[in-house]
Design a protein with these regions (language model features):
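Acidic, PIN/NYN-like endoribonuclease modules and their adjacent C-terminal/linker elements
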Residues: 1, 71, 98, 113-155
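Active-site neighborhoods of divalent-metal-dependent phosphate/nucleic-acid chemistry enzymes
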Residues: 51, 77-133
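Active-site-proximal, substrate-binding regions of enzyme catalytic domains
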Residues: 39, 45-98, 137
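A short, N-terminal amphipathic alpha-helix
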Residues: 26-30, 74, 118
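Short, well-structured N-terminal submotif of metal-dependent ribonuclease cores
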Residues: 1-42, 47, 51-64, 129, ...
Length: 155
């Protein structure tokens, strides 16, 4: 199973995102639904709302992304996946203890990686460098294998 963090999901949802093309290329090889946890929903939808407020995206892009989420859920591209909170936070605390001193992992990185473990994912897709380092340090396979080159945003 493949878990996609918010940087990857947002790249899929926003055609103008620097990472949209590589995200679409990776996702085209998926053979099962993308797990969509409550944390992923909150992070993706809040980021879209913030991007609209900060005029990073237009109202049309914002609304299209929300419609796409609903369509992807209805079509089974995204699948609601619950990560029980007690297990999520138990794993997150352990990841923090083991990896933050070396990687300087942020809480969101830790929670997304813990989510991948709780739902049984063996792969994590991300365009966030710190998230990628943490996932790799925990033994998860990380996609895309390398980061696209260019002037993408520092995530």
């Amino acid at each position: 199973m493949t878990f996609c963090d918010s940087s990857f999901l947002l790249a899929l949802l926003l055609p103008g995102d620097f990472f949209h093309t590589p995200a679409a290329a990776v996702a085209s090889r998926f053979r099962e639904s993308i797990p969509f946890t409550p944390l992923a929903e909150l992070e993706v939808t809040n980021t879209l709302r913030r991007a609209l407020r900060e005029r990073v995206i237009t109202r049309m892009e914002h609304d299209a992304a929300f419609r796409q989420i609903e369509a992807d859920l209805a079509d089974g591209i995204l699948r609601w996946s619950d990560a029980p909170q007690s297990e999520l936070y138990r794993i997150a605390r352990e990841l923090s203890r083991r990896h933050t001193p070396e990687i300087a992992a942020r809480s969101l990185d830790i929670l997304q990686t813990a989510s991948a473990f709780v739902i049984g994912a063996g792969t994590l897709c991300s365009f966030d460098e710190r998230q990628r380092r943490l996932a790799a340090a925990t033994g998860l396979k990380v996609l895309p294998r390398s980061m696209p080159r260019g002037s993408g945003p520092g995530r």
